[in-house]
Amino acid sequence: MTKDAAQPVILWFRKDLRLDDNQALNAAHLSGRPIIPVYISEPAPGAGPLGAAQAWWLHHSLEALDTSLRQRQGRLVLASGEALQVLCALIRESGAEAVFWNRRYDPSGISIDIRIKQELEKQAIETRSFGGQLLHEPSRLMTGNGTSYRVYTPFWRALEGAGEPEPPLDPPAKLRLASELAKSEPLESWKLLPMKPDWAKNFSDLWTPGEHGAKERLRAFVEDALDGYKENRDFPAKQATSMLSPHLALGEISPARIWDATRGLSKRVSAADTVHFRKEIAWREFSYHLLFHFPKLASENWNNRFDGFEWRNDDGDFNAWRRGLTGYPIVDAGMRQLWRHGWMHNRVRMIVASFLIKDLMVDWRRGEAWFRDTLVDADPANNAASWQWVAGSGADASPFFRIFNPVLQGQTFDPDGDYIRAYVPELRELGAKYIHRPFEAPRSMLAEAGITLGQTYPKPIVDHASARSRALAAYNATKDSASTRSSPRRAG
């Protein structure tokens, strides 16, 4: 081995906490150089402040990655501070002549990485960045006019037309990990886990963070739930979704690995189910496409006609929504599921978002921030794009006048009330006929179920019909005032 080949390469882990299908890791391995694996806790991370729920996940995910590296006679170096300063210190200490990483696609992360690349190259340090966090680079799929996509369906067609993604890379059988590593900070010193009271105490009942947990979740989904996915996915009481989103959010599994797992299943899984699931993966791709081309997606209306919308932003309403005390059972069940498990079924996410934005007229950005803090799968692109989609202000958004009726949504997608009973125990004894509208149940039936509205369970904080009319009036006023303004912002 040449002298240059013996110099270590720093492998900078970010939101790619896995050994499987890790292009930066594979390139470092193929270089033949000793690898120094490092994770840096940045004071201003690229994707914005780390939410409390995802901090819990990150703690356990880093533990899992460190365990995997120790099984290969290495370990994960933990360091905190400005990434450039940390990397320069590691380079001086180790003599490393290269830094490899997998790309991130949030605006702040992109600018940080560009600066680091420029500064390290001034020092004659090799830097190499790789894809793998998405099926396709956001700049690759463009319209025939060379512009970014603004509507999902043409984007999906373009993704299909791009051909099958490259097969995922298996982890190297052996890794040459550096034997002499820099001192690592204790993970506990980062204080990622909640202090008392431990509001995350129920998370581990549902989740196993780490690469192994991701692989097991994928295996179980493909074997047990992919068949019938299209029909069952909207029903929150059914175990019918992949629940891979938290693993994807921190890169414990790659989208290419998930996509690959759906190949060759035609004998036992219908093509319709496979395609529908792949379309959900493509929605994540579309969200990152939007964020890449419209960097202010998380803070500004994609459609600037909504800039003049008159939000009520009542703090009392917002707090009732956060606590799951709105008096609408499907909304309350969703918000309590979020608090208990750091996750919420996708159909219910749309329902609770519509209720906050349209029934309560609270700015979508407040809901987005709450989700970012309480979701274990918080994702800068998915979160912002989804909230703007519901608000009607986003790309290819649901029209604002499409206002979910929380009672009808509950009756349609939780007809027996099983989801409600799981998360709103006050209503457990109420029959299916009234469980989605206890405020209309006869007093005798409420008494028999042990329910006193306004005491054991809240009365509705808003009348849906009146709230709908109020929201539409505000929307029409905004539409009228914007009639002479410019068209929606183009992504770019």
Predicted regions located by residue number:
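Trp/Phe/Arg-rich N-terminal binding region typifying the photolyase-homology
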Residues: 1-167, 382, 386, 465, ...
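Intrinsically disordered, low-complexity boundary segments flanking structured domains
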Residues: 25-27, 62-65, 115-116, 136-142, ...
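Alpha-helix boundary/capping detector
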Residues: 54, 95, 117, 125, ...
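Soluble or luminal CAZymes and related metallo-dependent hydrolases
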Residues: 57, 61, 210, 326, ...
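Glycine/tryptophan-enriched, flexible segments
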Residues: 125, 146-303, 414, 418-492
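Active-site-proximal binding-pocket segments
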Residues: 235, 239-432
